[in-house]
């Protein structure tokens, strides 16, 4: 059953404008890009093109920001190199493209359309780490010891070449023994052994973080499936060993970058999640499930509780995860001044963290890249502290706005898909119950809607049969009543 995507595209653009984004690039930015004759080059940098680099991303991603490669050193230690797209050389500070990126601050991904932070000639071509292409990159290098702790690290620029463009789904299935070796991997000698090695290292990194209280959450994010411009299905985005591999490597790389800037006496645009103010409510959730959490925020205790609940009730765990995420509060960007107190990331259980690994997609990462390059060159920081403060505040606000745009379009896509299924019955789980209303997550297709009648006696986690009574595509409303 399909639904028109044209309406969804219009709603996505409308949502962008309403949230303060500029969905189109201004003429001066496009003129700047048109004047670029090719990708940036620098013959003075290290030449690492012969290494078996590979990218792992979504199936349809063309804005490739990262490549990874690993090398065994002995005694269980492994050297990891993460190559990050060199964007700053093609997008100088205070140019038209930079000013547009600074206003939007992020790429926005909706089912109907992607609104890239940078023009596609850059993000999917000249500054993308595309397969088979020579590119400049920022290298974040670190040694992972046998126990998952980090050893020596370094940052430098180099030339790289992506030997295999891989996708999360096929790599994850292959790693789990549930699918064949992906064709691009089979065509690139040595990449299969590389990914196996990287998977082992990533598991050590993850285990180390979990020991220190990193939270292992599972929030369901349905994605609209488009075919010939129409919404044909909603599917959950599956996390697997391939997504975990990249997440663990990027977390490590971001920490190395934060500590590098600190050691150089540079300011940094830190990514923080503060200690949760609503810890009392998280404790109440745990108590309702027969568990006790400490009186003050304790990441390790919360992590242990979540691991236990995932095992005890995997069906309801995504809903518990969503509640915890909301109670933890959103992440934000802050300025870390040299010698000043550092704020950490509660959810990742790390004290030093920046965003540095996606400069094609996020403005904070481009800012961080400029800071790194200045530090490497022995130059002054390209941003004054007060300018960084403004960037941090604006990026936090725009990230929240982008999430709202993406959520609004997901809801409208779900309403589009369901509008021909009025009066059908669905099985669901109550995900929210308050004076503002009762909300139900339907299992198939994976959508959430409001229970407008028959909510008496229901609470979060209860299973319930519901009947669809109305949808509003424009507003993304889906209304259910309790089925008799």
Could you describe each region identified by the protein language model?
Residues 480-484:
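Short, compositionally biased
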């Amino acid at each position: 059953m399909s639904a028109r995507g044209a309406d969804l595209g219009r709603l996505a653009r409308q949502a962008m404008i309403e949230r303060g984004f500029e969905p189109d690039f201004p003429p001066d930015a496009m003129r700047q890009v048109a004047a670029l004759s090719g990708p940036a080059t620098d013959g003075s940098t290290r030449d690492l093109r012969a290494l078996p680099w590979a990218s792992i991303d979504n199936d349809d991603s063309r804005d490739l920001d990262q490549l990874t490669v690993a090398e065994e050193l002995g005694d269980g230690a492994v050297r990891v190199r993460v190559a990050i797209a060199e964007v700053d050389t093609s997008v100088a500070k205070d140019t038209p493209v930079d000013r547009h990126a600074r206003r939007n601050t992020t790429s926005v991904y909706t089912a109907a359309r992607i609104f890239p932070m940078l023009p596609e000639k850059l993000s999917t071509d000249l500054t993308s780490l595309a397969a088979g292409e020579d590119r400049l990159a920022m290298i974040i290098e670190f040694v992972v010891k046998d126990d998952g702790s980090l050893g020596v690290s370094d940052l430098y620029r180099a030339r790289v070449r992506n030997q295999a463009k891989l996708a999360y789904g096929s790599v994850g299935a292959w790693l789990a023994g549930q699918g064949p070796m992906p064709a691009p991997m089979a065509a690139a000698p040595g990449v299969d052994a590389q990914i196996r090695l990287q998977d082992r290292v990533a598991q050590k990194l993850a285990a180390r973080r979990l020991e220190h209280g990193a939270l292992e959450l599972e929030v369901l994010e349905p994605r609209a499936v488009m075919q010939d411009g129409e919404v044909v299905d909603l599917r959950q985005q599956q996390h697997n060993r391939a997504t975990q591999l990249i997440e663990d490597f990027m977390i490590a790389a971001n920490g190395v970058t934060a500590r590098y800037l600190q050691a150089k006496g540079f300011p940094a645009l830190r990514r923080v999640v503060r200690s949760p103010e609503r810890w009392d409510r998280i404790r109440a959730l745990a108590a309702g499930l027969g568990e006790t959490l400490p009186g003050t925020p304790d990441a390790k205790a919360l992590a242990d509780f979540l691991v236990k609940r995932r095992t005890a009730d995997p069906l309801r765990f995504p809903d518990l995860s969503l509640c915890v995420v909301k109670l933890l509060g959103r992440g934000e960007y802050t300025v870390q001044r040299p010698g000043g107190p550092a704020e950490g990331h509660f959810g990742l259980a790390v004290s030093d963290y920046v965003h540095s690994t996606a400069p094609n997609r996020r403005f904070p990462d481009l800012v961080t890249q400029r800071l790194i390059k200045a530090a490497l060159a022995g130059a002054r920081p390209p941003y004054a502290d007060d300018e960084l403060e403004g960037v941090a505040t604006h990026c936090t606000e725009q990230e929240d706005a982008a999430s709202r745009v993406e959520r609004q379009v997901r809801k409208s896509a779900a309403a589009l898909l369901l509008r021909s299924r009025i009066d059908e019955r669905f099985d669901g789980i109550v995900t929210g119950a308050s004076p503002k209303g009762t909300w139900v997550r339907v299992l198939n297709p994976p959508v959430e809607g409001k229970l407008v009648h028959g909510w008496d006696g229901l609470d979060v986690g209860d299973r319930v049969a519901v009947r669809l009574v109305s949808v509003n595509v424009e507003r993304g409303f889906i209304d259910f009543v309790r089925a008799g």
